[in-house]
C-alpha cells in the first residue's frame, strides 16, 4: 500500500517584534523626507491610516522597481499616495505610474504630496474603477508593456485585477499583491469567514495552481505575493 507523505511543517526562525522590524527598516534604504511626511500626515489625520503601505514595503518595492529598470508601473489602490510616490521616486524622469482609485477623499492629499516631491508629472491618476482603467490600457494596445504592478485595493476585486494585470505585465515584470495573509486569518480554520477573507483565500489557491506564473508568497507586512508570468 502506498504511504502518503505528511506535509512538511516549517518553523519561524525569528520571532518578529517591533524592535526587529525597526532594525530591519533602519538597515534598508531610508525613506525620503517627503515619504516620511506623507506617512506622518496620514497617521495624524486619516482615521483609516492602517491602509497605508508599510515602510518596509516601500524600500522593498524601490529595490524591485530599480532591478527591473522599470519605466511603466501601475498602482491599484492609491489611498494617500505613498505607493505611487515610492514608484515615481524609484524611477528616472521617463518613468510613469498609472494610479487607480475610485475616490478623491484620500487622493486629494496624494496629489499635494506628489507635487511637493516633484514627481506629479510622472503619475497619471485615474478616478474610476480600476478594472475600467486596466481594460482601457489593454484596449489601447498596452498588453505586455508594464514592468511592475502593485495591487492593494478592494479585496473582492483582486481576482479581476490579477487577470487584467497579467495581460498588461511584460514577461519578466512583477505583479505584487498585498494583504494576502489577512492578518494571519488565511491560515486560521476558526477565523470568521467574511467576503474579504473568502476572496483572498480563493485567489491564493488560484495563484498557487496557476501554471502561467511563477509565484512566491512572502510574510512581509500583511503578506505580499510576487508573481512573474512565464510566457
Curated annotation (Swiss-Prot):
Cellular component GO terms held in the UniProt record: phagocytic vesicle
Keyword Methyltransferase: yes
A Gene Ontology biological process term: response to bacterium
Keywords: Metal-binding, Methyltransferase, S-adenosyl-L-methionine, Transferase
E.C. number: 2.1.1.104
Pfam families: Methyltransf_3
Single GO MF annotation: caffeoyl-CoA O-methyltransferase activity
Keyword Hydrolase in annotation: no
UniProt binding sites for a divalent metal cation: 152, 178-179
Binding site for S-adenosyl-L-methionine: 53, 75, 77-78, 83, 101, 130, 152, 154, 161
PROSITE patterns, A to Z: SAM_OMT_I
Reactions catalysed: (E)-caffeoyl-CoA + S-adenosyl-L-methionine = (E)-feruloyl-CoA + S-adenosyl-L-homocysteine + H(+)
Family: Belongs to the class I-like SAM-binding methyltransferase superfamily. Cation-dependent O-methyltransferase family. CCoAMT subfamily.
Name of protein: Probable caffeoyl-CoA O-methyltransferase 2
Species of the source: Dictyostelium discoideum (Social amoeba)
Gene name per UniProt: omt6
Amino acid at each position: 500500500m502506498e504511504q502518503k507523505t505528511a506535509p512538511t511543517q516549517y518553523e519561524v526562525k525569528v520571532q518578529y517584534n517591533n524592535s526587529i522590524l525597526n532594525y530591519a527598516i533602519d538597515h534598508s534604504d531610508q525613506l525620503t523626507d517627503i515619504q516620511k511626511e506623507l506617512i506622518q500626515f496620514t497617521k495624524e489625520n486619516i482615521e483609516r491610516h492602517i491602509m497605508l503601505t508599510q515602510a518596509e514595503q516601500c524600500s522593498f518595492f524601490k529595490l524591485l522597481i530599480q532591478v527591473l529598470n522599470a519605466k511603466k508601473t501601475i498602482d491599484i489602490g492609491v489611498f494617500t499616495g505613498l505607493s505611487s510616490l515610492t514608484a515615481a521616486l524609484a524611477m528616472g524622469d521617463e518613468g510613469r505610474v498609472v494610479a487607480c482609485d475610485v475616490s478623491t477623499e484620500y487622493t486629494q492629499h496624494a496629489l499635494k504630496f506628489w507635487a511637493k516631491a516633484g514627481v506629479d508629472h510622472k503619475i497619471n491618476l485615474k478616478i474610476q474603477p480600476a478594472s475600467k482603467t486596466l481594460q482601457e490600457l489593454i484596449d489601447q494596445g498596452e498588453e505586455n508593456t508594464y514592468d511592475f504592478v502593485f495591487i492593494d485595493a478592494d479585496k473582492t476585486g483582486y481576482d479581476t485585477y490579477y487577470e487584467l494585470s497579467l495581460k498588461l505585465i511584460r514577461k519578466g515584470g512583477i505583479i505584487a499583491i498585498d494583504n494576502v495573509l489577512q492578518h494571519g486569518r488565511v491560515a486560521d480554520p476558526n477565523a470568521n469567514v467574511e467576503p474579504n477573507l473568502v476572496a483572498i483565500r480563493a485567489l491564493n489557491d488560484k495563484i498557487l495552481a496557476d501554471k502561467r506564473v511563477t509565484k512566491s508568497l512572502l510574510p512581509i507586512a500583511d503578506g505580499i505575493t510576487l508573481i512573474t508570468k512565464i510566457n
